[in-house]
Amino acid sequence: MVKYLNQKEAINVDLELFNEYKFSVDQLMELAGLSCAHAITKCFPADRFGRVLVCCGPGNNGGDGLVCARHLALMGYTPAIYYPKPTAKPLFENLSHQCQRMEICRIDECPTVETSANSYDLIVDALFGFSFKPPVRVDFVPVVELLQQTKLPIASVDIPSGWDVENGKLNDCDLEPTLLISLTAPKLCAKHFKGKHHFLGGRFVPPALQRKYELNLPEYPGNELCLELETHK
């Protein structure tokens, strides 16, 4: 059975990938974001869900979102990026620049529920990852409220934004994505996920690291970058 990680385990696995296995942040971010794009194509085909709002947070989860948006643009989608608090680090500045040069639209104001319903077919939630601690910062309150109130399908990257990493929803009004894409290994909060699709992405975990943490990750089929897991309905 696949292991679901608590917050400390998730942080330690990441640290070992960086420190022991010498992966770089941008290397893992590229692989993670690409696997998210592939999972989205399997659940939301471009001919029906082509207009995508990608909501990016200030940390690595937001970086995954920027990478995902770039790959979606290459896969026949028309993404738009909402990035309310850009991170002033070269990696994130470069990712933003790449999206700009790919002619991906970036919007400056969070759309209303009504505007988003008319303008988009799908929302990608790449706001907060497994390091999130409540409360939500003021810059992100409007977009979190949009995610809570929208009727559009949502694809959440690793952690549904606003959820506790281990315990899931903190409030009844918290968002419930249609698709959850767990990265590296699922986190404990994924056991509380009731949506339609749960995918695993991030096909880069070394065998020795899998054994050390007893991750019991399923084998990815063929050359796939993601695979579907059972949901706990």
Curated annotation (Swiss-Prot):
Matching InterPro entries: YjeF_N_dom (IPR004443), YjeF_N_dom_sf (IPR036652), YJEFN_prot_NAXE-like (IPR032976)
Membrane-spanning residues: none
Enzyme class: isomerase
Cofactor binding note: Binds 1 potassium ion per subunit.
Catalytic activity: (6R)-NADHX = (6S)-NADHX; (6R)-NADPHX = (6S)-NADPHX
GO MF annotation, one: metal ion binding
Cofactor: K(+)
Binding locations of (6S)-NADPHX: 60-64, 129-135, 158
Protein EC: 5.1.99.6
Domain named YjeF N-terminal: residues: 10-217
Cellular compartments per GO CC: mitochondrion
Binding site for K(+): 61, 125, 161
Alphabetical list of NCBIfam families matching this protein: yjeF_nterm
Listed HAMAP family: NADHX_epimerase (MF_01966)
Described purpose of this protein according to its UniProt entry: Catalyzes the epimerization of the S- and R-forms of NAD(P)HX, a damaged form of NAD(P)H that is a result of enzymatic or heat-dependent hydration. This is a prerequisite for the S-specific NAD(P)H-hydrate dehydratase to allow the repair of both epimers of NAD(P)HX.
Family: Belongs to the NnrE/AIBP family.
Stated name of the protein: NAD(P)H-hydrate epimerase
Organism: Drosophila grimshawi (Hawaiian fruit fly)
